[in-house]
Design a protein with these regions (language model features):
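Nucleic-acid endonuclease domains
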Residues: 1-101, 111-220
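Short hydrophobic-acidic sequence motifs that mark active-site Asp/Glu residues
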Residues: 106-108
Length: 220
């Protein structure tokens, strides 16, 4: 039953029009995030030359805030998109950030800009150490897009996307909690390639070069 539903989710997120709608909605909504709104306000008051600034040129703190906002958008956009698919009973799991319940089965949703990993959290170690039902996205970011083109809808922050729907996935966890960092990296072993390559909806896995151990995420 679960494998049938997982494949139904994959089929849904493999439809070009659905993927295009997801990217479009993310691009429209991210233009409203606090960082971009602040830049527009500051430009309107003549205290910044933001129209000449590319996304790549934002400082690390501002970029991180954009990506955090994008992650929360992703959870909502995918959950609502899934609710439109006939045969899916979808609800938000309010007990755990990022979780969606589809036909009584819990799935985790995460997005990343990393080459081969998603960000986990040490408070979720038990869940992430077990096999997870996981919808994983990588954003293909247009780094050289001008910030004001994003704000004005001339060009989207996201140009491409990777979507995978992974059933009972066992991640490799890297990193541990420190006084200043409670985050860990969730990676997919090269050994799992034959299994997970069939679970990609949009984009591809890339096999790492030079004896790399973890699969790389390639948006399309």
């Amino acid at each position: 039953m679960q494998s049938t539903m997982a494949q139904a989710i994959r089929d849904y997120f493999s439809e070009p029009e659905i993927v295009a709608d997801i990217v479009k909605e993310l691009n429209q909504e991210i233009a409203l995030c606090t960082i971009f709104r602040n830049l527009k306000r500051e430009y309107d008051h003549g205290v910044t030359d933001a129209p000449l600034m590319t996304f790549r040129e934002l400082n690390a703190e501002d970029r991180n805030e954009v990506f955090v906002y994008l992650g929360r958008l992703l959870e909502s956009v995918l959950t609502c998109k899934l609710s439109l698919r006939r045969g899916f009973k979808v609800s938000k799991d309010r007990n755990s950030s990022g979780d969606v319940v589809i036909n009584d089965i819990i799935w985790e949703i995460k997005g990343t800009t990393g080459n081969n990993s998603w960000t986990g959290s040490t408070h979720a170690t038990k869940k992430e150490d077990d096999g997870m039902n996981f919808i994983g996205v990588k954003y293909g970011i247009n780094e050289d897009t001008k910030v004001f083109d994003i704000i004005n809808g001339v060009e989207g922050l996201i140009g491409e996307i990777f979507i995978g729907v992974f059933e009972k996935l066992n991640f490799v966890r890297k990193g541990s909690a420190t006084q200043s960092n409670s985050r860990t990296s969730l990676l997919i072993s090269l050994d799992d390639y034959d299994t997970v390559k069939e679970q990609v909806c949009w984009g591809n896995f890339r096999i790492p070069q030079r004896n790399g151990k973890y699969l790389q995420l390639e948006p399309a």
